Amino acid sequence: MSVSTSVVKSMLQLTNYFGSNFTPKTETISSLAELWERHGSMIASMMSCDTREFGTADKFYEVIFRKIATTSLSFMTDSLEPKLAASGDSLEICKFYALFLEYMRKDHSGMLTRALEQASSENRVDTAVLLDMFLFFDNVYSESTADDWWACLRRDDEDQEASSGFRTPKRNNYSLTSLQTPTATARRLRTASSTARRSPIAEAVDSPTMKFMRSERELKQSKARIFGLEQMLGDLEDDKTKLSAENRTLKLSNSDLKSDIAKLKGIAEEAQFRAEELSCDLEAKKDEVHNILQQLNESRMTLRSEQRSLEEADIKKENLTAKLKTVTEDNGKLMKQARELRDLNDYEFARFRQQEQELTETLRATQDQMADLQEQLTGVEKIRASLKSENESLSASVEELSVASLRNKQDADNSKTMLSEELARFEETVDKLRQEKLEALSMANSRIDALRLEHSEREKMMKSTNARLQADLDEERNEKKRLMNLWNELNEKSLNVDKAVHKSNEEFQSMGSCLQNAKRQIEQLEVACKSKDDIIKFQEEQNKRAANLIKNEKAIRDQASAQFAEKLAILKNSLAEKENETVTLKENFASVVMKHKAELEEKELFLQSRVDLIQRLEHEVADLREKESAEIKKSTWMGERIKIFQQAPMRGSRIRCGSPDSLPDFLADNGPTITEEELRAQLATFPRKSIAPSVDDNEFDKGTPIGFKSNMYDGRESICSLDFFDRSSLQRSSMRSESIQLASPSSAGEFKQPFTPSGVTKERVGVLTARNEKVKPHLKCSYASEVGSTNSPSADEENIKKSKKKNRRDSIFSAFSSKKQ
């Protein structure tokens, strides 16, 4: 059957109404297949779902299914099919929407009621169909069955006819006589509504007196039944009070056991929590050991990297020493060149002196020609002024060159001092780094990075200083070349001056000044050579210091490596100790875990014993209930037997008494051989013992009422029969107050109070041993049972059967038989 069109229409109208009033507004839908796509987020928000954005129909219907399964409508979810609903099945979609409306009716009834009232007032929703659906749901709740709860959604016959089109049915050609209503019989049978077992003929034949007598007889029977039932009710109420008292005691014991179980559960939970804490501690110790091993490996790696960096520093130092050697070689070459220049200057000075002597001779020769050359003096003076200007420029250039050379020397000295300071600073930083790394291995990475950066910067600085020194050397070489060029130019100019002097005598003084300037320049060059010699000596001393520093650094490095080896050995020893500690901790933890496991097993065994005790108590309660039913039967039988003994005369009882313990039967057979006073005196000598049973503690049927088939043989009819009562000392000690006893004359006609042992005491044990020494018990298990020791060998029936049997005690009738004989 398909879905009703009216239901689909009303659902579409209602969901479109919800969509128009929802914020943000949603689009209207024309079929229920578009419900998840356009109104899915609205329905999810109205049902307070966690997921409100759906990409597929499967996800939407799965989320709605899970939400409904968590509500009170979960018993209806067995018939939902999310996959069919996602595929577009209209019946499954209507099921989901119907449960959605039912959820809204239960959890958001106010909102749904306002929406339906407003929609019905605006004629936008056909609410009659929805109200019928809600009424159908109420009927489902009242019937407490969820079978076919979606029957209200199916199309009925009228909907089928309406969907197929209305049409007039065809007329049938039935005759009116064939449509007569059937009638009942002329007279109903009397047994149609009667519950009597007698036949209606017997009821008709009976006379009124017979009916009256029958009613009287039934009244007497009912009264007797009522009286018996009232007595039974009284006995049952007594039994009920006793059972209720026992039930209360059992409940108290059960509550105590539950409290013990709760305490044991708390202890077990604490033990489990302690075990978890110990496991967490072990994990933490493992993590610490792992971290220590990682730190050790990292320290080894850092030490290796430091060794590599030190080796690289050694290589760089060797390179620097090689560069210093090259610098010293260059300085030697420069010194050699300076010596050559000095020799050349000496040679030129000697040549100038020779020329001076020659010029003096020429001056003497030319003094006579001075007058003639006065006219040419003005021109020579001009030439002299120009030469003076040139000499001044040359002297300035020489001074500048000397200043530049001094500046270069100072720069070289500064660079060398900077290098030495940087080397000293580097060595100090290396020592500090070594100490810091040996003191704190955790800061190795950061310090290594800093050292690398500093080392790279220092390499850059050393490279820049080397490049600057190389540039200075190149500049000095260029300056040397320029000086050589200047010297060559000076030589050329001196030659030109010589030519001019040879040409004119007036140029002698100018040449003398030029010679003086040349002497000054030579002196300056000598001073420069001396300064260069000093610089070379200083560089040699610095080289020696550098060699000494390198030696000291090697010694310090060897000492540091030895210290590092010692500390590494100490760390290895500490690591071995830590590993031993971890092994001991693991062993201790394993022992603690085993101990706790044993404790937990003991606690579980204790709990299992408690559970077994509870089950045993439950079984005992069931046994008590069975005893109650048995007691009811016994009470009925005892009532009947008591009535028989009360109503029957002594002789009738004598006829029924077949037990050898029956005193009236014995006296009737043998006659009164002794008087009553003698009999009472004899009875007084014997201890009083109860022979009545404890009906409440006996769980076997000992007889049945008259009229029922007995479960014993016919000879056991006496209430005083020995076979009727269990000769157990425990049952004798727990007899009811209504039990009958053979008593002494002082206690004749009174009931013996039941013995309820309050526990085994020293006095009680003494009393029992004294009694059993005088009169030994019939059963070996009686003493152990009465004392309460169930572990005694006499408490086991198998031991009793296998052991040697005792002679039966003499009964009370032995005295009579001995007197008779």
Curated annotation (Swiss-Prot):
- Look up the coiled coil feature and give its residue ranges: 211-634
List the molecular function annotations (GO) for this entry.
dynein complex binding
The alphabetized list of GO BP terms reads: cell division; establishment of meiotic spindle orientation; establishment of mitotic spindle localization; gonad development; locomotion; mitotic spindle elongation; nervous system development; nuclear migration
- The annotated regions of Low complexity compositional bias extend over 181-199
What pairs make up the disulfide bonds?
A: none
Can you say where in the cell this protein is located?
Cytoplasm, Cell cortex; Cytoplasm, Cytoskeleton, Spindle; Chromosome, Centromere, Kinetochore; Cytoplasm, Cytoskeleton, Microtubule organizing center, Centrosome
Here the segments flagged for biased composition (Polar residues) are 162-180
Question: This protein's superkingdom?
Answer: Eukaryota
Annotated region (Disordered) at: 161-199, 736-758, 779-821
User: What are the alphabetically sorted keywords of the record?
Assistant: Cell cycle, Cell division, Centromere, Chromosome, Coiled coil, Cytoplasm, Cytoskeleton, Kinetochore, Mitosis
One annotated Gene Ontology cellular component of this protein: centrosome
Assembly with partners or alone: Interacts with gpr-1; gpr-1 forms a complex with gpr-2 and GDP-bound goa-1.
Q: What does this protein do?
A: Essential component of the spindle apparatus required for spindle positioning and chromosome movement. Acts to recruit or anchor gpr-1/gpr-2 complex to the spindle and cortex. Also involved, directly or indirectly, in cytokinesis and in the coupling of DNA replication, centrosome duplication and mitotic division.
Name the record gives this protein = Spindle apparatus protein lin-5
Q: Which gene encodes it?
A: lin-5
